Design a protein with these regions (language model features):
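A glycine/threonine-rich phosphate-anchoring loop and its flanking beta-alpha core
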Residues: 112-213, 218-219, 317
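Short glycine/serine/threonine-rich phosphate/pyrophosphate-binding segments
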Residues: 20-23, 44-47, 74-77, 99-105, ...
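ATP/NTP phosphate-donor binding region
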Residues: 1-91, 347
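N-terminal small/polar loop signature for handling phosphorylated ligands or for N-terminal nucleophile
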Residues: 47-115, 119, 124-125, 243-255
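C-terminal charged capping/lid subdomain of soluble metabolic enzymes
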Residues: 315, 319, 323-399
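Short alpha-helical scaffolding segments that buttress acidic/His motifs in well-ordered protein cores
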Residues: 196-200, 258-266, 280, 300, ...
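Active-site segments that bind and position negatively charged phosphate/pyrophosphate groups
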Residues: 208-333
Length: 399
């Protein structure tokens, strides 16, 4: 096998305690009129006020848009961009969790190219660069600070939708673990489990033939040497730090591991992509109205059990990264870790009713970009069996 890898990343990535204090000097190199995109809770936070003061001290004018809503409804992104046009920002700064960062990406896109988010759904539909983006995450999970993806919710489709383009990767990302110290245990668990799922799905994704041009034709190309490097590092960090961060939010060493793990997982899946756990979560989330991280983490042990015959070498490497004895220990240990931090053990526990199993399976099978990235194929009946097993809490029937 020829060694092949590709990486898409911010032009500048800062990680470490206190690095948020570099915002003013960085922003001043990108423009003089900054639009901050955040939510109402963070807009009233002292940390955000301090960031605004930094920008103003650097002679950067600031407009704060605190209209971000969970899961970024399409209409909210349209309204935010409309309201910002008269201000004419030079750059957009997203501050907050994954929804705030995805909202910032969407607003920068609409301000740059017009139209509606619907015009850009799918891969590579963004025609060119967007306004310079700075991403400052305050949770450790989605990895949006380094990925080419913005996820929104579309009421007309009753599902989350994605805009995927390298043009959406922030120009600068500032990952300061101190901003996560106040994150509640429940949110820490959900976000961190999402990050661990990103890393595992990126590491176990299908490996495609690296024909020249594949990284230009597709946003998500499957696993490769570079994505594997970041994914394995992320798995090790998250396995070490996640439970500790949930138990003691003031444990700065654990917070650092979780945030760095989430960022590295973003670098991994930003090129490798995710797979079946994400495909199934989208319809599950639509009908149960549960958090994305809860759904993908709940599903991960079942998806890995199905995939196990195709990913034996990867399971051995995950075992090494996680400090486990061998590949057979990985899936039970992952399920136990998730149980200890409060992840539901089955889709039934998540609120999915029996009568929606067939619908979820049908919808999941239709998300071809994710199913085609899965290391073991899933036909419609196999998908139905997988969803039913995850609903009933029965991994054994997938072996």
């Amino acid at each position: 096998m020829n060694l092949f890898g590709t990486l898409r990343a911010p032009r500048e990535l800062l990680f470490g305690a206190g690095q948020r204090h570099a915002l003013g000097s960085i922003a001043a190199t990108l423009g003089r009129r900054a639009l901050i995109v955040t939510d109402t809770r963070l807009a009233a936070d002292a940390d955000l006020r301090a960031l605004v003061d930094q920008l103003e001290a650097a002679k950067v004018t600031v407009l704060v848009d605190s209209s971000t809503l969970p899961d970024v409804p399409v209409e909210s992104a349209i309204a935010s961009a409309k309201n910002a046009r008269e201000y004419r920002p030079d750059l957009v700064i997203g501050i907050g969790g994954g929804s705030c960062l995805d909202m910032a990406k969407s607003v920068a896109l609409l301000l740059s190219h017009g139209g509606r988010p619907q015009d850009y759904y799918g891969e590579n539909a963004v025609p060119g660069p967007v306004l310079p983006l700075i991403a400052i995450p305050t949770t450790a999970g989605t990895g949006s600070e380094v990925t080419p993806v913005a996820v929104l919710s579309d009421a007309e489709r009753s599902l989350k939708v994605g805009i995927s383009s390298a043009h959406l990767i922030p120009m600068v990302s500032i990952c300061d673990p101190e901003l996560t110290l106040s994150c509640p245990a429940g949110l820490t668990a959900i976000a961190g489990a999402d990050a661990l799922t990103h890393a595992i799905e990126a590491f176990t994704a299908i490996r495609r033939d690296p024909v020249p041009g594949i990284a230009q034709q597709r946003v998500f190309i499957g696993k490769n040497a570079l994505s594997d490097h970041f994914a394995l590092s992320a798995i090790g960090l998250l396995w070490q730090g996640l439970e500790a961060a949930c138990k003691d939010g003031a444990d700065q060493a654990a917070r650092e591991k979780v945030m760095l793990g989430a960022t590295l997982a973003g670098l991994a899946f930003g090129v490798a992509g995710t797979a079946a756990a994400h495909a199934i979560q989208y319809p599950v989330g639509a009908v149960t109205h549960t958090a994305h991280g809860l759904g993908v983490a709940c599903l991960m042990p079942y998806v890995m059990t199905w995939n196990a015959p195709a990913i034996r070498p990867e399971l051995a490497q995950i075992a090494d990264a996680a400090g486990l004895d061998g590949p057979d220990d990985v899936i039970p240990a992952l399920a136990a870790l998730f149980a200890r931090i409060g992840i539901p053990a089955s889709l039934r526990d998540l609120g999915l009713t029996d009568d929606r199993i067939d619908w979820v399976a049908e919808q999941s099978s239709g998300i071809s970009r994710l199913i085609q990235n899965n290391p073991r194929p899933l036909n419609p009946q196999e998908m139905r069996n997988l969803v039913a097993a995850a609903h009933g809490g029965d991994r054994a029937c997938l072996i």
